[in-house]
């Protein structure tokens, strides 16, 4: 078996809040959206810099409060980009984690966490 890609599913409860957080604040783009009909829950794929996420309003797809562990580079630039945006609900910092990575953790409006990790030093740690 060869694994091509793992795509986390994250539960959302408001399309408006999800768009504000993932698109406007984090800079993801919508790759596609799906609804079974005009009143059905939304299922959409968003991506940025190789990170692909599926955001779902569907009950039973997944539980809120998940954590996605992301290995990345350019954490300092990403941190500066986030702080340049007018998003009043988060002002994340970068911390050196016990597992040896510099870490920037974000919690979305639905309790899901994105934990961005840079090994070898965003902050020289």
Spans of features found by a protein language model:
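Conserved short beta-strand elements that form part of the metal-binding/catalytic scaffold
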Residues: 31-65, 113-118
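Conserved beta-strand-loop-alpha-helix junction that forms the acyl-donor binding cleft
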Residues: 11-15, 36-39, 98
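Conserved beta-strand segments that form the floor/walls of ligand-binding pockets within enzyme
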Residues: 7, 11, 54, 105, ...
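Vicinal oxygen chelate
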Residues: 15-16, 68-113
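N-terminal beta-strand motif that seeds the catalytic metal site of vicinal oxygen chelate
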Residues: 1-19, 31, 66-68, 118-125
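Conserved acetyl-CoA-binding loop of GNAT-fold acetyltransferases
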Residues: 24-30, 87-88
